[in-house]
Amino acid sequence: MGSILTLGYSACSPFRPDVADSATIKEAWDEFSNPADSARTKVWRFHGETETTREGITADLEAYKRAGVGGVVYYDQVHGKGEHALPAFSVEWWEMLKFAASEAKRVGLSFEINLSNGYVAGGPWITKALSMQRLTASDTIIRGKQQFAAVLPAPGDDEFWDIAVLAFPVPQNQWMTNNSQRPKVTCNLPGVSAEDFFCKKSRLTTIPPQQPGKSVYINLDFETSFTARSITYRVSKRSKASTGAMNVPGAPADEFYGSSYVKQPPLGQLEVSDDGINYSKVCDLKPIYQAAASRWDQKTVSFPAVTGRYFRLNLHDWCLAGDQRPEMALGNVTLSSRARIDQWEERAGFYSEYILKNLTPAYTDEEIIDLKTIVDLTSKMGTDGRLEWDVPEGDWVIMRFAHESTGGPSKHGRANLKGLECDKMSVEAVTTQWNNYAARMIDTLSAINVKPDGVIMDSHEAGAQNWTPGFEQEFLRRKGYDLFSYLPAMMGYIVGSVTETDAFLYDLRRTVADVISDNYFGTLQTLCNKAGVDFTAQATGNGLSLVADNLQAKGRVQKPQGEFWAKHIHGSYDIKEASSAAHIYGKRIASAEAYTDAKFSQSLAELKNLADFAYAAQVNEFVVCASAYQPWLDKYPGSTGGGRHYCLNRNNTYWEYSRPFWDYQAR
């Protein structure tokens, strides 16, 4: 009995027999026998797939109450076309929201709202300047002993904001690429221009599936010796990123793999030849995995300097048997004499992956940038990008750094209020999101005496960011040194040494994670406190598609939340992360998005087994993902969330018999 009471009372507030008396034991037993509504499971109630009716709202909420559900979260999440759904924030939408909140209060259910239309924090009020940001740069190599006066190349294709201009001496023969040297390029792919693989454009070139062992060759003939140290390319992503808080259980290893991750073979190899006949391998061309909603598709592979007239990409056997998408899309290939950090895009936070052993070669001092030689030319560039500089002797590279929007969008909301995701490191951007969505709903419902009980936040799935306005001050304050001289390292160049550069990139990622925890989740918690509502957040979520410290981020919110799905039978859930954060940071509630994507074919007995697993991981609040809003009284199964079932609703044949299932969870 004692162990059951301990588990039921609170996973994060253990029962204390040393201070208990008969009164407290009786009180605990009474609470266990007749759980308070606050202990009951809640549901995410997805709207936006269908029309909205008052009778449907009432029927849903009364059915929840009958079954023993404790509360609902109003959440506009759309996976189908939503053809008959009301536009968000329309007069009719507001009327239905107010009616739903009023009905929830009438029947005795808690009523919470989602932070955003869809997920996770964005909308049309988020301009490019307030959206997620990343560093970008252009470079120009010039001869010394001259008065340089010219407009530097734009560092971004669209809107961007300048940060700094730096210059450093580099021998010209160590800054060459196939773009500067213009080799003859050919390929053995009928109907495809080899030039398409190398030109800078947004669309990649599709390579059709090949028979096992058959190669597609993309050839470069420099007509003279060329020394290469790195290759950069964009390629279609495959499988699912190994990054994930939802790791497949296993023994400690150098690599950890997330749910649905399948290790992919290389795309092929880069090869070199002196005669164009006999080739030797330079390096494997590594694949890129699909991180949650990340648009980033560029990778750089570094290798010791290799010289030859002929180079080729030998592409073969890049997919596994049974792959649903056996073709490959490739483009923006750059073979370069520049020494780069291997896979710098991940280490600099453009793309979130586990940071494994640094495989960058041990380049010589002559091949890397000497920190002491970097010159700050920021003050010499005008607002129009024109730089005037008396260039010292030698070959010099000028880099113009700026930040730009990543373009990361909000997902699965009503069409008229979708937009860019807010900057996760900007208090201004986060507050703008709050003021334009959650605050409006809280104020409107408060005016009719049905103020929401809380605000919830889903997992982040909009890719990574590594910059925000004022980031340099955040870095200086937190790390104690100026990052400006290391900006080239954020674009993959080696500054000082490989070890020094890697140490800086660690500090960079650590700072990004810290600022996201403080300025994103910390700000939202402050805003919820001021509004007098609870805050539950999947900070930052199981997909880990941006650089973050999930335990730290969860510690910034009132109720840290993980999730467990109904289909991941191997137990790869991130709920233990939520309960760990609750223990570390002294939170009373460790919440869980529960039974995600449960199907009509799954019984309550199956779901109970999952519940027991989650309780053993010490979470003590369930919020079902999801229960699709049902507008009709005479259609079955009714709305299925765009085909995802969302079956825990009044149209399920076992609903009226499910009270023991919900009572069990409350205890």
Residue ranges and their predicted role:
Residues M1-S22:
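Bacterial Sec-dependent N-terminal signal peptides
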Residues F15-A39, H47, E55:
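N-terminal carbohydrate-binding accessory modules
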Residues D21, R40, I57-T58, V72, ...:
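Carbohydrate-binding surfaces of carbohydrate-active enzymes
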Residues A36-F46, D76-E83, G407-C422:
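Acidic/histidine-rich, surface-exposed loop or edge segments in extracytoplasmic proteins
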Residues T50-A85:
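N-terminal cofactor/phosphate-binding cores enriched in small/glycine residues
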Residues G123-S202, Q290-W296, E353-I442, E472-V512, ...:
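Active-site-adjacent "subsite" loops/lids of carbohydrate-active enzymes
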Residues C199-N278, R295-D370, S459:
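Aromatic, loop-rich ligand-recognition surfaces of beta-strand-rich domains
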Residues V282-Q290:
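Solvent-exposed serine/threonine-rich low-complexity stretches and specific carbohydrate-binding patches
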